[in-house]
A protein has these predicted regions:
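Conserved alpha-helix/loop element of class I SAM-dependent methyltransferases that forms part
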Residues: 33-51
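Core SAM-dependent methyltransferase catalytic element
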Residues: 214-239
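A short acidic, Gly/Pro-enriched loop at the edge of an enzyme's catalytic core
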Residues: 111-123
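Class I SAM-dependent methyltransferase SAM/SAH-binding core
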Residues: 56-112
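C-terminal alpha-helical "lid/dimerization" subdomain adjacent to the S-adenosyl-L-methionine
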Residues: 8-12, 155-210, 220
């Protein structure tokens, strides 16, 4: 496991641990981000096309972001059937309340997106990119399915440098770990595995370079308050 790839055995174990977070996912995520996660999700929505657009969320999890996305044709992809089963009623009930069409839920991996070239007006990934088993391959697939000129927006933990990374690890390992242990009621809680993926996650700059390497233009990275997350953006070239 390194900043680009996760081995197949590790990835399968990671998926099992992610599925174990479903009952308390939002509660612990809100605690881990000091209540900022909803603000970050709003920032992503503001960066994506908002009218008559077709948007793909890669790694939708239990639907925490998708439930508040409105005015667009939304497709949610996740490798976990259990995540999709949790997300579908949650998201589509909100869509029905707003008089919108249901979201399309698709099981699949970022590295093998089951969509045709130039299919989407925008893509996003929130707290999922870190868990892709091959980030470079996944970004290559994202740029393939985007329409020319369309944008990808990614949110995941910030790691400005080694010192910042150590502080982030301490936060995840000690503070969030203690809270997760209380909420989950077990010592061997699934957030231990998520801390492991944070350790091997690269720096903010690593993924700027990676996005540029696979062909994205106008790539930017913004570390957002309180220094716990990064928002990466990039556009597919017009031609």
């Amino acid at each position: 496991m390194d900043h680009e790839t996760i081995g197949s055995e590790d990835w399968e174990e990671l998926i099992l641990n992610l599925e174990a977070t479903i009952p308390v996912y939002d509660r612990i995520n809100r605690f881990a981000t000091i209540g900022q996660v909803d603000k970050w999700r709003r920032m992503v929505r503001e960066r994506l096309p908002s009218e008559d657009a077709k948007i793909l969320e890669v790694g939708c999890g239990p639907g925490s972001f998708a439930e508040d996305v409105s005015g667009v044709d939304l497709v949610c992809l996740d490798p976990s059937v259990l995540m999709l089963e949790a997300a579908k009623p949650r998201v589509n009930s909100k869509r029905q309340e707003r008089g919108e069409s249901e979201v399309e839920f698709v099981q699949g991996k970022a590295e093998e997106l089951p969509f045709e070239d130039n299919s989407f007006d925008g893509t996003c990934s929130l707290f999922s990119f870190r868990d892709w088993y091959d980030k470079r391959a996944g970004l290559g697939e994202v740029i393939r399915v985007l329409k020319p000129g369309a944008k990808v927006v990614i949110v995941d933990p910030a790691k400005i440098n080694r010192i910042h990374g150590v502080l982030g690890w301490l936060w995840m390992r000690v503070w969030v770990g203690a809270y997760a242990r209380i909420i989950c009621g077990v010592k061997d809680h699934p957030w231990k595995w998520l801390t492991k993926t944070y350790v091997t996650f690269g720096t903010t700059r690593d993924y700027v370079r990676m996005m540029e390497d696979v062909g994205f233009e106008n790539v930017s990275a913004k570390v957002v308050f309180p220094g716990m997350a990064t928002i990466w953006e990039g556009r597919k070239p017009e031609s």
